[in-house]
Structure formats: C-alpha cells, structure tokens
Amino acid sequence: MSFPKGFFWGGAVAANQVEGAWNVDGKGPSVADVATYKPNTDVKDYKSHVAMDDAHIAAAMADPDDTYYPKRRGIDFYHHYKEDLALFAEMGFTMLRVSIAWTRIFPTGEEAQPNEKGLQFYSDLFAEMHKNGIEPLVTLSHYEMPLALATKYNGWVDRRVIDCFAKFCHVCFERYKDQVKYWLTFNEVDSVIRHPFTTAGIIPSRVPEDKMLETCYQALHHQLVASAMVVKDCHDIIPGSKVGCMLTKLTTYARTCAPDDELATQAKNLENLFYADVHVWGEYPRLILKMFERKGIHVEMLPEDAATLKAGCVDFVSCSYYMTMTESVDPNAERTPGNTVLGVKNPYLPSTDWGWQIDPKGLRYSLIELYDRYRKPLMVVENGMGAKDVVEADGSIHDPYRVEYFRQHISEMGKAIDEGVEMWGYTTWAPIDLISASTNQMSKRYGFIYVDQDDMGNGTLDRSRKDSFYWYKKVIASNGEELD
C-alpha cells in the first residue's frame, strides 16, 4: 500500500458546527442557528430532527439563548482556533477543511458591502493555518445560508439567491486569493432531497406535499448553476486554483441478485451520482431528465443555463463517505437509518449507535467507481464515526473503536490507490468533537480531540487528546504506511 508523495492528511469541520459566536462581530443569523436539539426525540428519527416551519423559526429567533440551539455555540472555535490548529499541527495535519459562514460576510445575504470583521476573521484563520503548515480546503456553502434569504425567498427555490451567493463567493475569492488554493462549492449537494431546509433554506411547510420533490430539484438546479458560475469566477481570479464538487457517497448494494432488486439498486446509484455528473460534465444526464419526465417533475431551466454549466466544470471530485446502503423491492425487508437516510439493513455489516452501518470495503468500491466514471482526482473530505466516549478518572479517553474504524477505512483507501485511483487527500470527520449536523448533539463524538461540553452546553470547553489522536499522528507521519 503506497500513498503518493504530497498526499494531504487532515480533518474537516464546518463553521456552523464549530465556530459558535453566532451573533458576534456583525454576524447575522443563519439557517443553522434555528436548528434545535430535541433530547426526547429518537436519535435515529432523522426526519423529526431536521423538520422546520415558519412557527419554529419565529420561536427560535425570539429566544436569545443557545441551550436548545447548539450550533449557536458550537465548540467556540471562533475564540479557540489558534489552540485547535496547534493540536492539528501536532498531529501532523497538512490540510484542514473548513467552511466560511456566509452570514459573517453578508449577514442577510443582500448587503451592498461585506462585513469587514467577518472577512478579517477568516484572513486570520488562514494565516494561522499556513503558520502551522496546514493547507486550507475551503467549502463555500456547508449547511448554512442567511436565514433572511430562507424566510424572504424560501431559500434556493428562488433564482435570485444565485446572484447573492455568487457575490459572496466573488468577495471570498478576491480577499483570500493569496491564502486559499483549494475550494469546494456546496457540501453534500445531493442532500437537498433529504433535508431541504438545512441544505437549501427551503421551508417545507410553504410547499404543497405533492410539489416538494419538484421544489427540491428546482433549488438544486439553482445551486448547480451557481456552482458553475463560481467555479469559473474562481479560475479567473485565482490562477492555478482547484475547485471541486462534494457529494454524499451513498453506494447502494442489491439485497439479493433478483433482477428487480438489481434494477432498484441501479436507480439509487444513478440518482446518487447524477449530482457529480452535472459538476464534472456540465450537463444533466439524459436518464435523469427522463426520470423527471416520468415523475412529472418540471425544473425551470433558462436557455443560458446550459452554457453556464458547461463553462464551470470542476477540477476534482470530493465526497463524504460514512456507510453504504442496501436496496430491496421487498416491503417487509428490515430497514435501518443512517446519515438522514432510511435503507434496507445489510446483515453482513455492523452498525454504530446511531444506526450507520460500517463498511470499509464500500469506501474502496466507491472510490474505484468514482474514478472510473469521472477520471478526475478524488478527495475523501469526510469519513468517520460518531460514538459515545468515556473520560476515565485520570482524564484519559480510550477509543479503540475509532482507531479500528479508521484503520480499516484508510487501509481500503490505500488499496484503491494501489489499483489505480488518483487521490489528492483525506480529511476525517471530524478531528475534534463538534455539534452533530443532523441531531445537534455534542455526545455524538467524532474527534481525535475531546471537547468538554455536553448536549446542553455545560462544560469547560477544555480540549484533550484521545488515544486516537496519537494513532492518527503516527499514520500521518508514515504517510499511511503505519496503521497498527
């Protein structure tokens, strides 16, 4: 197993899950700031956790507290980033994926001028990253947008949001052109279908149920057009820049070799891949357009959109990978949740406490599939497992389950490289404990670094190294050769 020289090793976080300081230095409210922690809701009931309507938004904005709105506080990375970057550097990180909070730069999304304090924060962050030998990989939209655009326009459903986003991105490219080379446009762009408010600011209660799917695809189209526009803008402003797309890689297996199961599985995989298809090839696959037609889905596309998509193709493909799915036409097949998706349970795979099935070989399968399809360099920019960690009396945190998870996944990633897949880097989700995207929990811990904070926001916020911290440090130092 041989990882290439210069391979990027690191971790990934999102502004809305780590920064906190939700109303500090001119930042406006984002859709993430009204996401609620629901302690009495089953953690596997993802649909209930991501539900949203106007009444909920109004109640949230009337409540200045952050107790039940954990993304308002995050882990206070806004004030702790130097400490955290020093820990990442100690592990040997050569890349850190972060996102820029749109509402730090344009609080409502429609200001004439950007917020200088917000711009300066990221200038300082990127400078500190370079000081620590860490290359920034920056996501421009990671599960947040100005709440004002969601309530005024129903988010990305309205085409006017494209120009708001393009302006935000243009400002970022101009400001950080000497600090950031690697960019991603939208995080898990496919997830608008699964959680429309989180991903695209769509308030579901405003949309008739029989029009919800069409509405999601309309918002998605606007995001795809916006992505193409900003890819071209980035290339124009930053010579040598590399801009990628990012999808949730949900490879689906057939439960049986029955032809009906195989056909259902094929449909799932085509759906999962089409989001990257548009980013890479600059056009919608014919099979997807026919699917729209069969389902009576009308997506309004302007005549000039085709040329825009063609002119803004990405340089590389990135993905999150947590699990695989299984498909069956049998309505009685046992099902299991995971990553906001309900699928058929795979009897050959173990599961996390949150129902996510663990499949290291599925990562290898997925990377080979992606590279064979696109012939573009790949990055895995999210991979990890949420678990409940225990702090021992002496302060130590033993997490052999996390080490084993990463050992197996990194091993399979290395095998994919040996088989010919071109990969640029790997950033784990997440290198430090943070607020969960779906359930808004703190107790669902991903990090190599423990953060002393509970689900209700109690704790010192002190950082401490888990056993996995030292293990990943060894992996990076050996460029992936030492996994024991």
Regions found by a protein language model. Give the residues of each.
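Internal amphipathic alpha-helical repeat/solenoid segments
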Residues: G74-A86, P107, G118
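Glycine-rich, proline-tolerant flexible connector loops at the mouths of alpha/beta enzymes
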Residues: I100-P114
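Catalytic domains of carbohydrate-active enzymes, especially glycoside hydrolases
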Residues: H80-A101, A311-V317
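Active-site region of glycoside hydrolase catalytic domains
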Residues: M1-D65, A89, T108-E110, L119-D484
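Active-site mouth loops of central-metabolism enzymes
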Residues: D66-H80, V157-R159
